[in-house]
């Protein structure tokens, strides 16, 4: 398993994108950009804020996992990650197509912080298949222990949806550990509009 930031200078690219939204071209000031003292904490704040300019930073995951796990990972499409998976086409591989869901497949996925965190929200959920959830935990631990501050920050921002929603489950049929987010929203609705119906 490996992660790699695809940007040569993520901090510069991010700050350039931010300045462009303000109508300022900072390309001439490339040497003026300094790394923050607590870079991982800086990135955590930026990732949690989730401004659109953060999408200019991309990173790649490459690994080999059972086909059943790979399919669950690449089907998490919020934030538009870009997956590539080892082909099973007999005319390319010279082998018959396998129906074994546990056959290992090489895959690669390009992510933004947003797309990876959205995938983690889904795949760290207690309702996710155990093998997929355990693989997602491995990915998060790998990110959290990365030497790259941006990747480390992404790892620490990964948690199930219920944690992002203040311990309120967004699923229709959750695991039962937390109350449903929809119940809180419905109660708000009833408190505001019950007399109209």
Residue map of PLM features:
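Family-specific signature for flavin-dependent thymidylate synthase
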Residues: 1-197
